[in-house]
Amino acid sequence: MEAHKPVLFDEVMEGLAIRPDGIYVDGTFGRGGHSFGILQRLGPNGRLMAMDKDPDAVAVANKALFEDARFSIVHETFANLQKAVRDRGWEGKVNGILLDIGVSSPQLEDAKRGFSFSKDGPLDMRMNPKQSMDAASWINQAAMEDIRRVLWNYGEERFAKRIAQAIVNAREEKPITRTQELSDIVIKAYPQRKIKKHPATRTFQAIRIFINRELDELRECLPQCLETLAVGGRLCVISFHSLEDRLVKRFIQKESRDHLPREIPILAKDIKHRLKPLGSLIRPTEAEIKKNPRARSARLRIVEKLS
């Protein structure tokens, strides 16, 4: 099976500095583009563990790579990365970890998954369909203030209050069960002015992040990455919006800067930083954006574990 070439592929492969006999973790298998790239660079003694909470992604991995003894996949969120690594006896031995945050292209393109405002389908949005709460269940029972808070906190939506009110008004007439229904409600609630993005972009993003606990899981995962990496190991994180990137940036700053109070009598040279940022923020080239417009908002940060 030939995998699609994912966002920032070359930059990730270079950033991971893959050793033929190394141990690597792809925390977000998706459709396997990055995992295939890692395997191409590993020797017979190298190992790659992938993770994904979407059963469709796990099925793709099992079908495409079941004969490769170097590869294994765990049907699990990367928020449980440390346990999965520990179960293999790899804690403190991992040479590289990749996290490619957010919704995947196949998830967006499948109307039945309910992630896209441009394709009519059931209002689902669960990355793992086995979890109990889907978007429709939540949107039809949440208080208006809770909806407003989610739209603002996870979508940075300026018109969160009026959209939340419009949702509550609409569901009083009949339950909201389709993506197109929600999209139409948001469009009607939006001020009639020229905007670059589709009016429902931030609303769908916010609800998806909330339903899947995306920021919570990223917040839980990052310290686990630090514990599982070997000294000299690399962490590459691709994010697609400012909320994710801000969280990653703050974690890196916390672990790579002096953060002891000044009154503590310790020399700067004696402070042991745990991470070292490698270069600055990496964005896709214009050539990549032209081939894949979805790459436009991607941002890559790479760090190395020092101690």
Swiss-Prot record:
Subcellular localization is given as: Cytoplasm
| A biological process from GO | rRNA base methylation
Q: Which UniProt keywords apply?
A: Cytoplasm, Methyltransferase, rRNA processing, S-adenosyl-L-methionine, Transferase
Q: What class of enzyme is it?
A: transferase
Entry's family note: Belongs to the methyltransferase superfamily. RsmH family.
PANTHER family documented for this protein = 12S RRNA N4-METHYLCYTIDINE METHYLTRANSFERASE, S-ADENOSYL-METHYLTRANSFERASE MRAW
State the protein's purpose: Specifically methylates the N4 position of cytidine in position 1402 (C1402) of 16S rRNA.
Q: Which named protein is this?
A: Ribosomal RNA small subunit methyltransferase H
